[in-house]
Amino acid sequence: MTTTNYSADDTALLIVDPYNDFMSKGGKIYEHTKETAEAVGFYDNMRKMIPAVRAAHIQVIIVPHHRWREGDYKGWKHMNPSQIRSNEARSFAAGTWGGEFHPEFGPREGDVIVLEHWAQSGFANTDLDSQLKQRGFRK
């Protein structure tokens, strides 16, 4: 087993889209990801990694997807397939259980929560790049 040491000065853990719709049984997207998540031990690994990162005083950054609201995509001419599906399913709908952060994997006091992203990239149209650079995170 290889041991890697990470410095809290330049390392952050990014947790992407930790919503109930994605990470909880009964969530709108959960069944689509369940098989792969279970095959790789995703949830068990997250349950080990997040507390270890917090104990090492490494910054946690939450990278949330946009929470669906009525009319969000009205008039859009160039929605990608993911946005079309998200709009139809109302994934991560604001004000619903599915749009709430998962109780185990969501933010805690001291975490940084970046602006919500609208598609597959946590960088496009958010402040993630700026947050990482301003805080000196390179890993």
Spans of features found by a protein language model:
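Active-site acidic carboxylates
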Residues: 1-108
